[in-house]
């Protein structure tokens, strides 16, 4: 004798309202200039396509960074209007082929000042002003911890 049971019940979930927010994605690494991308958040349940993704990037912000001694305003550099010689670097950062950079208008905030690069032991303060609001953050580049005794062992019979 085989018995099968099943139930169906419609469940309605009340999803809270969506409020667009600013997303700030920044990094500074040892020996590299700071790079900041600013975009608008997207609703989780909205449809997504390339155009809606690309339209979410923000331009027109005022972005400053300080290392405790020097404060600079970062330059807005957009993919459709890059300074000569920077195309390969921008393509690598954005993950877009160099041949397609001009087709997109993605703006990043950085500096072409070679004296302002990430340094081990420094703490950096970021300030972003956009649409009448100011957002702040800080980060530090910590001293790297060296590996004491790296060993690679290959088990017999494994390739």
Please tell me what each predicted stretch does.
Residues 3-6:
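C-terminal motif of bacterial Sec signal peptides marking the signal peptidase cleavage site
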Residues 8-159:
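A sequence/structural signal for flexible, mid-protein segments enriched
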């Amino acid at each position: 004798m085989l018995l099968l049971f099943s139930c169906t019940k419609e469940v309605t979930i009340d999803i809270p309202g969506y409020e667009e927010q600013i997303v700030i994605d920044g990094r500074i690494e040892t020996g590299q200039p700071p790079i900041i991308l600013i975009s608008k958040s997207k609703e989780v349940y909205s449809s997504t396509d390339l155009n809606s993704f690309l339209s979410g990037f923000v331009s027109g912000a005022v972005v400053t960074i300080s290392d405790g001694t020097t404060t600079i305003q970062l330059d807005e550099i957009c993919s459709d209007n890059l300074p000569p010689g920077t195309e390969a670097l921008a393509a690598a950062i954005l993950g877009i082929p160099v041949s397609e950079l001009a087709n997109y208008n993605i703006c990043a905030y950085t500096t072409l000042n070679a004296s302002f690069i990430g340094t081990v032991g420094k703490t950096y303060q970021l300030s972003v002003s956009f649409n009448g609001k100011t957002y702040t953050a800080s980060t530090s580049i910590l001293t790297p911890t060296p590996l004491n005794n790296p060993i690679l062992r290959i088990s017999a019979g494994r390739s």
